[in-house]
From Swiss-Prot:
Metabolic or biological pathway: Amino-acid biosynthesis; S-adenosyl-L-methionine biosynthesis; S-adenosyl-L-methionine from L-methionine: step 1/1
Residue sites binding Mg(2+) per the record: 19
UniProt: K(+) binding residues: 45
Compartments, record wording: Cytoplasm
Residues reported in the UniProt entry to bind ATP: 17, 171-173, 237-238, 246, 252-253, 269, 273
Gene Ontology cellular-component annotations: cytoplasm
Identification of the protein by name: S-adenosylmethionine synthase
NCBIfam families (alphabetical): metK
EC number: 2.5.1.6
Length: 393
């Protein structure tokens, strides 16, 4: 029997966090190539530090002239990302930061294992394990600690960028310790919020006065009480932020990107990777499947694991765990999953429409628990497979 009464903690980071700056640039590069060619191959990594951004990795287009043209756009893509995030500080400014582009063409040896040949479906871009998770504890079928940690930072970014709160800077982190009773979230025992601020004379109390109304706005009513412990900018001043304060790298916030530690993680990052890479596409598929299992009423919680081998199209294994919250045997759910969805790399991309420039928007505030969008963004958050799963079990 799983625990019913406990405290669980998750954190999030803002779009201005150094690692998220890098995720954003990597996904913006990916979107640029997918705009030109839906089958483009991209593995883009970004490093950011004081006054410098380095972009490297592998890319591939069928048209070599177009490939050279797009290579020339990388500098401006990175600057546009930094500008939109809001960095205009002396040692990290979108106009003056030095951009180094080390991207090159994808290895033919990798391509031969992934590309479809006559009579053979394309293989997975790498080996690996991917997890998906869903739970009834929030309307988005996400764990509450990570979902509301994201919501706090997203709201603070909105009021910073629209000019309502000009004292706030782009770099911020949140952390919520959520109280569970009978397995459901009911309150917050402690809250941590650290945000960069542009006025060096602001105190922690000043910052709390700015952010507290927005935090109360996004959290469910009654979750904050007199017993909730607040830590707002607990170290004091936070003026130097972003890549000038700490170096950033693509792919270092994989728990923030997923379930906040409430579910297993296979270890593969998402940003900068085109959807032939199962680190990304199969993790999206696993979330889609888990969410649809829960949306179908087959369980209150569901964890899905998929595994792949490089160059092999079909998953090596499908695993489901409903954590004792459903009446359907996990083995029956596994069989149903294999029946209702093609889990080859191409099958996933086709089913979820992943060969589109829909990735830059995923780079901050979580890849999961978002609303599906009209242009195909966050398609893995749809629940259109629920009825098929119910029939298949």
């Amino acid at each position: 029997m799983s625990r019913q009464n406990y405290i669980f903690t998750s954190e999030s980071v803002s779009e201005g966090h150094p690692d998220k700056v890098c995720d954003r640039i990597s996904d913006a590069v990916l979107d640029a190539f997918l705009t030109e060619e839906p089958e483009a191959r991209v593995a883009c990594e970004t490093f950011a530090t004081t006054n410098r951004v380095v972009i490297g990795g592998e890319v591939g287009l069928s048209d070599q002239a177009k490939l050279r043209e797009y290579m020339g756009r990388i500098d401006q893509i990175a600057r546009d990302c930094i500008k939109d995030i809001g960095y205009e500080q002396d040692k990290f400014h979108h106009e003056t930061v030095e951009i180094t582009n080390l991207l090159h063409e994808q290895s033919a040896h990798i391509a031969q294992g992934v590309n479809a040949a006559e009579g053979k479906d394309e293989g997975a871009g790498d080996q690996g394990i991917m997890f998906g998770y869903a739970t009834t504890e929030t309307p988005a079928l996400m764990p509450a600690p990570i979902q509301y940690s994201h919501a706090i930072l997203r709201r603070l970014a909105e009021v910073r960028k629209n000019g309502t709160e000009p004292a706030l800077g782009p770099d911020a982190k949140s952390q919520l310790s959520v109280i569970y009773r009978d397995g459901m979230p009911v309150g917050v025992s402690s809250l941590v919020l650290s945000t960069q601020h542009l006025d060096p004379d602001l105190t922690s109390a000043d910052i709390r006065a700015i952010v507290e109304p927005y935090i109360r706005e996004v959290l469910p009513e009654g979750w904050l009480s007199a017993d909730t412990v607040w830590h707002v900018n607990p170290t004091g001043k936070f003026v130097i932020g972003g890549p000038d304060g700490d170096a950033g790298l693509t792919g270092r916030k994989i728990i923030v990107d997923t379930y906040g530690g409430a579910a297993p993680h296979g270890g593969g990052a998402f940003s900068g990777k085109d959807p032939t890479k199962v680190d990304r596409s199969a993790a999206y598929a696993a979330r889609y499947l888990a969410k649809n299992v829960v949306a179908a009423g087959l369980a209150d919680k569901c964890t899905i694991q998929l595994s792949y081998a490089i160059g092999v199209s079909k998953p090596l294994s499908i695993y489901a765990d409903t954590h004792g919250t459903g009446d359907i045997a996990p083995a029956a759910i596994e069989k149903a999953i294999d029946t209702v969805m093609d889990l080859t790399p191409r099958g996933i991309r086709t089913h979820l429409g992943l060969n589109k420039p829909i990735y830059e928007r995923t780079a901050a505030y979580g890849h999961f628990g978002r609303e599906p969008e009209a242009d195909g963004g966050f398609s893995w958050e749809r629940t259109d497979l629920a009825e098929a799963l119910k029939k298949a079990v």
